[in-house]
Swiss-Prot record:
Pfam families: MMR_HSR1, MnmE_helical, TrmE_N
Family: Belongs to the TRAFAC class TrmE-Era-EngA-EngB-Septin-like GTPase superfamily. TrmE GTPase family.
Function description: Exhibits a very high intrinsic GTPase hydrolysis rate. Involved in the addition of a carboxymethylaminomethyl (cmnm) group at the wobble position (U34) of certain tRNAs, forming tRNA-cmnm(5)s(2)U34.
GO BP term (any one): tRNA wobble uridine modification
Cofactor annotation remark: Binds 1 potassium ion per subunit.
Residue intervals of the TrmE-type G domain: 217-373
Protein name stated in the entry: tRNA modification GTPase MnmE
Taxonomic source organism: Mesoplasma florum (strain ATCC 33453 / NBRC 100688 / NCTC 11704 / L1) (Acholeplasma florum)
UniProt-annotated binding residues for GTP: 227-232, 246-252, 271-274
PANTHER family for the chain: TRNA MODIFICATION GTPASE GTPBP3, TRNA MODIFICATION GTPASE GTPBP3, MITOCHONDRIAL
GO (cellular component) term, any one: cytosol
UniProt entry keywords in alphabetical sequence: Cytoplasm, GTP-binding, Hydrolase, Magnesium, Metal-binding, Nucleotide-binding, Potassium, tRNA processing
Amino acid sequence: MNNLNQTIVAPTTNISTQAISLIRISGDDSFNIINKLLKTKIKEEKNVWVRKMFDGQELVDEVVITSFVSPASFTGENVVEIACHGGILNTQRIINLIIKNGARMANKGEFSQRAFLNNKIDLIQAEGINDLIFAKNELALKIGVNNMSGAHNQSIINLKGNLLDIISRIQVSIDYPDYDDVEGSSIPELAKALSGINEEVNNLLKRSKMAIKNTNGIKTAIVGKTNVGKSSLLNALLNEDKAIVTDIHGTTRDIVTGEINLENISLNLIDTAGIRETTDIVEGLGIEKSLKIIDEAELVLFVVDFKSINDEENKMIFDKLENKNYILVFNKSEFINDIERNKIKDLHNNFVYTSAINNDIDNLIMKIEQMHINEEIINNDSLILINLQQITLVEQVKDRLEKSLNAIIGGMPIDIVNVDLHEAWDYLNQLIGEQYDEEIIDNIFKKYCLGK
């Protein structure tokens, strides 16, 4: 665990050639340290100050200082934020002066960690900050903002309250077995109450698992025969020349990857080697990889040429896709006539036309969004978690609740039921940060940016 008694400093903006850099100091000595660098001192109060900063008698910079007094700050400590002129040398020089005068460099996420430890934010809010910073699309951004603000955290508090009520009823029954008239402590009443809590937890888990696919990225394989336009499609989707495109069959021999972020969904794209019969050992290894990636993909974009759709290679790919989520992509649409389009319409229902070489891929984007964007998630105003560690904790809560419910219905001794309920309670506390392991907390905040 970081030493909370030390005053820390870090840049809150990237150190680069830019107009303005922001530097944050947090800790008991924040005002003392900054005043060592000023001829005209600032008071220990919430305010904004324009000051000249000195190293001894040498002018360093003219800065704007925003000061906050404990506990009314992000970290809950005395905080001084300095807006100085940008530039790598100037920013680093000021940070070095602050360290020289009594601060130490903050670790990654240490400001947020102090905010959590000083009860300024709970753990869901802290994770929400990181979700917001690393958001890849609008859905992730919305969830990050909601969780950072604590807008929906009351739902966890309510779950805890309802669970504690059940635990208390059971404990009374254990401690006073002769009293059989404790309100709400009969087996049917306990089972009903537990079922309600379990349903809420299941709904939270369902929402979160649906959302995390869209926010973290859906593993999307681009597959097909050689020379049907797979690499051109990847380049068009990424809007860059990531993959080599030639008229020579078998150009792509290894896996080429990229990422595309749409409004409410992200795709982790994988361009695979063209699938065909070959005696080339290197190309054959690439084809083996392609077939393996089809198995692992969550979405497959199967690129085909209409004129060869029924040949052996395509039939083999169709067989691999029997139980997969896929879109049939008729690329080079400029060469498909109306008669051929009518035949396609009669034979297939999940297809799109594209012309990657002309960047005409809007139909494909729309189809992907239709298949994977759930309006229930987009418009949902309830708590959604998009962090794997949080989802794991919710799964543990669900597991203990279901064990307890099955035990009650199965006539198990009530004290055994209470053990699982106490564990569910502990996991809810860990989720919101009211109960934690110091090493786990350190690991959580190490994922954050320096200065956050």
